Amino acid sequence: DVIDVIEQEATRDLYAAGAVQAGDDDDYFSSNLFTVARRRVVWLAVLVLASFFTSEVIAANEDVLQQVVLLAAFIPLLGGTGGNVGAQSSTVVIRGLSTQSISSLGPLRAIGREAMAGALLGVLMMLLVVPFAWWRGESALVGLSVGMSLLAITTLAATAGAAFPLLFDRMGLDPALMSTPFITTCTDVAGTLIYLKTAGWLLVHLPQLVQATGISTHFFAFGVF
C-alpha cells in the first residue's frame, strides 16, 4: 500500500546517503551477510580508489612536510572539518529538494548561500583552531597555513555539498546518490591539496613578506588574522 511504498523510498534514500546499496527487501538485518557486504562494497571500493588521490597529494608534497613536520598533524583535522561541512550542506540541500522548499530560492542562490555559510563557518572555526595550531606547531607558519586553508576548505566543501546534489537533480538522477561519504572523500582530497600548497607557498614567500614589512613573523601573522 501507499505507506509501504513511502517507507521503502525513505529507506532507499537513507541507504544512499550512507553509501549503502538498497535491496528489494526492507529488512536489512535479516539479510545474508554476503548480501550485506555486496551492498556496501561497491561504494566503498569507489571511495577507497578516490582516497588514493589523497595519498598521492601527500607524496607529491613530501618536501613541504619534511621542512615542517608538524604540518602533517593537522591534515586529519582539516580533512574531517571539510567533510563535515560538506555533509551538512548536502543534507540540507537534499532535504530542500525533497520538500520542494529550495525551488523558491533557485539553484544558484542556494549554492551561493551555502558558500557564504561555509565561509562564515570557516571564520568562526578559525578563532578556535588557529591559536591551537600556532601554539602546537610553535610556528606562525603553521598557524597561518591552517587558518587560511580552513577558510578555503569550508567554503569549498559547503559549495560542493550544495552544488553536487543540485547537479544530480538537474541531470534527472537521485540527489541522494551524492552520498555523504563521497562528498567527504572529495573534500578530503581537495582539502589536503589546498593545505599543502598553501604551506608550500608560505614557506617561500612568508620570509619575503616579513622582510618587506619590517616586522616579526608573529606580528605579521597576528595582523593577517
Residue ranges and their predicted role:
Residues 11, 87-90, 121, 125, ...:
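Alpha-helical transmembrane segments and their lipid-water interface positions
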Residues 8-21, 60-69, 85-110, 161-183, ...:
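Juxtamembrane helix-loop transition segments at the membrane interface in multi-pass membrane proteins
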Residues 60-75, 137-148, 178, 209-214:
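Membrane-water interface of transmembrane alpha-helices in multipass transporters/channels
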Residues 196-214:
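Juxtamembrane boundary at the C-terminal end of a transmembrane helix
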